């Protein structure tokens, strides 16, 4: 599987703001060596755009995999859910992820100190479009699970993880049919 169709930054350097970025010089050096300007005018991380992950053939798990999701599933975990969705033997159970299905911002997220107020903020430098992003909604959704299992008042009151319970029930049902 692949993670990204496109992974790019709008700039190859943080100049003239380097002094306001924690480790700004190192960030500039990193951007210089890991990005390349493409015809679209953006600076791409080509290595990660081309990277294909393949299953290991030795000592690998051959059973079914259930991935639990909910609103706080975002950033790298949303990327993971997108990459796993539709893979043989993988089922996403729970709620829509909080992270974007179409893409995310991140990869390098430097600390920036605003010069007058000294407020510290973090701003992602890269835009990542998920692999096969043309097959998912462009705006407004996270990764949709294969099996929806939302919260319930009763589960909250009794401190029951109803997503985990649903998966346990599915596994037991499958095992009893074998």
Task: Indicate residue ranges for each PLM-predicted region.
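C-terminal "post-core" interaction segments
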Residues: 1-178
